[in-house]
């Protein structure tokens, strides 16, 4: 829809729009975030071993709940309930920033329902912690300039690239990992995404990830018609190849079902809570950046303290609310911030139609089942693009202000020492358990802490 075809009300947050005009604008936002909202769940449930077998129904339920929660939290962010919600034109969804930390928690706890329960327990507590931060946002903002937030975002992206590449090859648990079929399917999805992204069409560009995924499904279906779908492993046992679509799951799923509260019981374990609490500080900073970006880009003004505080509070309580439904933390979606900045459409009702559509999707298990059968290589083709773009976003944040010797030192040491320690757990083998819990596993948490400490410790001067 061209800008000239829109009512002037589309460019006012509280403008009155007809459903006919609002719906396509809301759907554009859903298309921009739909896959990204479900990708973290697909990756973490896979890492926990909850992708198939006896856990197949659980995974469908979690995907269904992810859509429902994203829709509800989006509406709260748009309209607010008291101090909860910033009344800002932002779409909320499942955060990919936690994937690295949750992957390390999963590895340290041996996977399974216990590890996923620990992730839910940590998310529940961490969300409440972020809520408290939302009430004391002013001093927090002063501690976290763009060089710190950029370093953190960069470390998040770096930690996710290997996750995306694993999916690109078919998933590292697949017996045909790295096969020609998996690689070609992933490359095909990536090429489709790139073509759509640079097609010149706003609609195709904003929905490029979803279009790439759909084309990946079609390609996998056609491959199943002309290529062998099974093979023999080294022991001579037959297995189904990772790229094969299991349509039986979709056929067996219901058309309608109410959401299930606490499909996974929260477990409170310090191995998960300690690093996740740090990540929620990072998430609060990201949300501040997203709200600032969407207000400046869409409304041409600075965000108010009330908008920022309400947005972060909604972020925190939304994440705790998500944990009650077995869903990973909810946060603002940066790709939707970019869409608002590009189109200047900030109408609350238009975005709300997208939130309502997500809620309706959350009541349809067949849709969750359809997503759950996505081949890892199809997901990987999209994930490589999504996760690498996070790296670029981090670089853009770091270079928002001229690089000085001070900022270069913060970035270099935070990434080198923080990420290096996180990537080599053995170096903390003789450290106190709490130190190992916070710094071990993912490189995100140590990089964030080192960047914050160096920003406080290194004095500022005229030369930087």
PLM regions: where:
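N-terminal signal-anchor module of multipass membrane proteins
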Residues: 1-90, 97-109
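Intrinsically disordered, low-complexity non-transmembrane regions of multi-pass membrane transporters
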Residues: 1-25, 229-261, 296-301, 453-464
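Juxtamembrane interface elements at the cytosolic ends of transmembrane helices
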Residues: 2-7, 37-41, 45, 188-199, ...
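Membrane-embedded helical hairpins/re-entrant loop segments and their flanking transmembrane helices
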Residues: 19, 45-87, 274-348, 463
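Hydrophobic alpha-helical transmembrane segments of multi-pass membrane proteins
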Residues: 27-34, 124, 148, 179-183, ...
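Membrane-embedded hairpin module used as a gating/binding unit in multi-pass transport
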Residues: 37-38, 216-221, 225, 232-319, ...
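Short, non-helical or kinked segments that cap or interrupt transmembrane helices
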Residues: 61-62, 84-98, 142-151, 204-211, ...
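Membrane-embedded alpha-helical modules
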Residues: 107-226, 353-464
